[in-house]
């Protein structure tokens, strides 16, 4: 499938990803979903894709959420999890489809609604084109698009550079409670490391 000149491609995005910011609702930061390092890196890149395709183009309304399919190649999977870990990255993407986040909200009638949502609806692999298609769940988008209050800004390039899921989570909490986000390289310099 040929790509348009301005179309988001994972590889092109990764060349410029350092210090790119995405907003997550604090609900996502505080959720009890347990992701490993590679799964979380995939979520950061999904967030970047959503930002480029829906926030930057001002398509953040439900009518535009029909085309929620992100395409990956083996090269893209290698960037997420390491060139020698493509099968592990493939497994991580499949696992994200099984992980649910508990949600609660009040509907327009004032009724409290409880449910469970996930990041990925479906995951496909085309054996001919060797392209992985990941369909993002539209239910997660309100927590990533047009978030105006109770959100955390994350530098995804920074977050992807960490080597453990615990460090990633700590960075998310640091961003949440710092009032602004901070890059670890500047923080390390200030602390004398």
Which residue ranges define each predicted feature?
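Charged, alpha-helix-forming regions
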Residues: 1-193
């Amino acid at each position: 499938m040929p790509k348009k000149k301005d179309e988001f491609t994972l590889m092109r995005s990764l060349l410029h990803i350092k210090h790119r910011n995405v907003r997550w609702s604090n609900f996502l930061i505080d959720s009890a979903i347990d992701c490993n390092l590679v799964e979380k890196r995939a979520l950061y890149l999904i967030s970047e894709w959503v930002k480029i395709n829906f926030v930057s183009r001002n398509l953040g309304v439900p009518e535009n959420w029909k085309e929620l399919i992100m395409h990956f190649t083996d090269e893209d999977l290698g960037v997420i999890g390491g060139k020698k870990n493509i099968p592990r990255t493939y497994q991580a993407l499949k696992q994200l489809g099984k992980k649910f986040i508990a949600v609660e909200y009040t509907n327009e009638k004032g009724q409290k609604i409880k449910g469970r949502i996930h990041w990925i609806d479906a995951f496909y692999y085309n054996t001919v084109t060797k392209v992985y298609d990941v369909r993002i769940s539209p239910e997660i988008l309100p927590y990533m698009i047009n978030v105006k209050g109770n959100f955390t800004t994350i530098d995804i390039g920074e977050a992807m550079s960490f080597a453990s899921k615990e460090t990633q989570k700590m960075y998310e909490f640091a961003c949440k409670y710092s009032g602004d986000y901070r890059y670890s390289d500047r923080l390390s310099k200030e602390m004398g490391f």
